[in-house]
Amino acid sequence: MIRHRLTALALAFGASFVPFAPACAEAPAIHTQVPGYYRAAVGDLEITALYDGYVDLAASVLLNANKAEVQRLLARKFIAGEKVQTAVNAYLINLGGKLILVDTGAAKAFGPTLGFIGEQIRAAGYTPEQIDIVLLTHLHADHVAGLLGADGKPQFPNAEVRVDQAESDFWLSEANAAKAPKDFQPFFKIARDSAAPYQAAGKWKPFSGAAELAPGIKAVPAVGHTPGHTAYQIESKGERLLILGDAVHSHAVQFARPEVAIEFDSDKKQAVATRKKLFAWAAKEKLLVSGMHLPFPGLGHVRADGKAFAWVPVEYSPLRNDK
């Protein structure tokens, strides 16, 4: 009897001390990516990669290789399907006294997956109004349309814009636009519209050849993709970054097969020759390189691989001061 009472008391005592278990609310999925910026150092300079967004390109735009070979190379990188997600990047260079932006993204020229350069600049701790110089690799819409904001006004009102003279002459010519295929004519208009307010303000300033555009920043003529396509070399304290522009569109295909052109190249033979030359230079000199269509942040190295090349992306890293 006593044992039964003790058991009952123990059960009652234990029941009164059931630990409180708070109700757990469901955690909804966020469905958005983290801000698209990434910092790296080149000597004393701080480089910020900016993610404008992405565009899905058909694998069929890659030329000089049969479809089976292209699909094989894509599959090696676990890229499946006919559409290939392709990043659109830009790069912000902090010189200490000046801020220089290389390319401006697509604005909304290619739909809602692009056009986030202004947003990423702010997320990175700057404002578009702080940009002193915009360097353009070329005047295709996904590089120049971001000169204008959503309101149609200059997104970088305090910046002067530098671009190769031949590139400027070609794309801003109404005569060239009239001779172009009809479905390509809108891209001439985008270039003209993007440049117009900067021209009116006296801030559109073309250069020629291998010009030095700021301390440690040189233009590297890289024609072929367009008539005045330009790469840029950034140098500080013996360290160098080569911004390739559109010398490469597909990391999965064009490093392994640098002879593969893309439908958008204005001079495909020259574009291939330029790509091979830039890749060989980057590999020999062990340059840090970046590209506007390499997977974000688009920073890495080029390694020689027989008669071809391999892309070696950088490891995510803090900005170290212990070197």
Language model segments and positions:
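Histidine-centered catalytic micro-motifs
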Residues: 134-144, 222-229, 290-297
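Cap/insert and terminal regions of metallo-dependent hydrolase folds
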Residues: 111, 231-233, 237-323
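Active-site metal-binding loops of divalent metal-dependent hydrolases
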Residues: 52-53, 104-107, 139, 166-167, ...
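Active-site metal-binding motif and surrounding structural segment of the metallo-beta-lactamase
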Residues: 87-90, 96-98, 111-162
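Metallo-beta-lactamase
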Residues: 115, 122-126, 130, 157-160, ...
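Bacterial N-terminal signal peptides
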Residues: 8-19
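Sec/Tat signal peptide C-region and signal peptidase I cleavage site
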Residues: 20-25
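Conserved beta-strand hairpin/beta-sheet module of binuclear metal-dependent hydrolase folds
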Residues: 32-124, 231-248
